[in-house]
Design a protein with these regions (language model features):
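Extracellular glycan-modifying ectodomains
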Residues: 1-174
């Protein structure tokens, strides 16, 4: 199994947030490219990376230490893809929010990562209506939130299951 090859401390700093355990969009895209290679699918090229500097981000590590000496900014790609999304079997129009930083939160350690990337759901389905393509099952966690919809672009329906939430929590999966 091929894994992401981080060649230097500078590359590591680019791939991962300073204040959070998650990867930045740069790390996520490196993982996305590796997954595309493994699955034999074409990656989406020329993705425009944006860093949302309208709100300081203090991730899980900063929150644990209650340390605000270092901050990050949420980073993402600026792309609009045409798909329908379902959360736990229901149309997600009211659940899945646009990828935007909430500016109405005053708590310094608010989890913008979860909010921005629509986390905390056990079953998300992306339907690209590519009926001539296969379906895909992703067993993922919070690291998949940044790229699952990009991977799903190469398939008809993609089911993203997070075993930590909802109906899968502490149960057998069959």
């Amino acid at each position: 199994i091929r894994v992401m090859d981080v060649k230097s401390i500078d590359e590591y700093k680019e791939y991962f947030y300073k204040t959070d355990h998650h990867w930045t969009i740069y790390g996520a895209l490196a993982g996305y490219k590796d997954i595309c290679d493994m699955l034999g699918i074409d990656e989406i090229n020329n993705l425009n990376i944006v860093k949302h500097k309208n709100r300081l981000y203090y991730g899980s590590l900063a929150k644990t230490a209650l340390n605000d000496n270092i901050n990050d900014y949420i980073s993402d790609v600026d792309i609009k893809l045409d798909y329908d999304v379902y959360v736990n079997g229901k149309s997600a129009d009211s659940l899945f929010k646009p990828r935007e930083i909430r500016l109405d939160r005053s708590y310094k350690y608010y989890d913008y990562y979860v909010q921005y990337f629509n986390g905390q759901y056990g079953n998300v389905v992306y339907d690209y209506h590519n009926n001539d393509k296969e379906n895909l099952l992703i067993i993922g966690d919070s690291y998949s939130w940044q790229i699952d919809y990009l991977i799903a672009n190469s398939f008809n329906k993609t089911h993203v299951i997070n075993l930590r939430y909802d109906e899968y929590k502490n149960k057998d999966f069959n």
